[in-house]
From Swiss-Prot:
A Gene Ontology biological process term: translation
Pfam family of the protein (one): Ribosomal_S21
Source organism phylogeny: Bacteria, Pseudomonadati, Pseudomonadota, Gammaproteobacteria, Alteromonadales
Name assigned to this protein: Small ribosomal subunit protein bS21
Species of provenance: Pseudoalteromonas atlantica (strain T6c / ATCC BAA-1087)
Annotated InterPro entries: Ribosomal_bS21, Ribosomal_bS21_CS, Ribosomal_bS21_sf
Length: 71
C-alpha cells in the first residue's frame, strides 16, 4: 500500500495527487478491479494468453512499421 507523508505547509490537493500517482505506479486500482470477481484458472490462462498474443502482434507491427520507413 502506497504511503504519502504530508509535508509541512503542503496543500491537501498536492498530497492527494502524490498519493494517487503512487497508487497508480503500484497498480493498486488495477489489482482491485482484477480481484473484484473470482476468475477461474482457465479464464485466467485464456486472458494471459490473449494478452501475450496482443503484445506480440503489437511488437511485430512496430517492427514492420520501422522497416517500411527505412526504404
Amino acid at each position: 500500500m502506497p504511503i504519502v507523508k504530508v509535508r509541512e505547509n503542503e496543500p491537501f490537493d498536492v498530497a492527494l495527487r502524490r498519493f494517487k500517482r503512487s497508487c497508480e505506479k503500484a497498480g493498486v486500482l488495477s489489482e482491485v478491479r482484477r480481484r473484484e470477481f473470482f476468475e477461474k484458472p482457465t479464464w485466467e490462462r485464456k486472458r494471459k494468453k490473449a494478452a501475450a498474443k496482443k503484445r506480440l502482434l503489437k511488437k511485430l507491427s512496430r517492427e514492420n512499421a520501422r522497416r517500411i520507413r527505412l526504404y
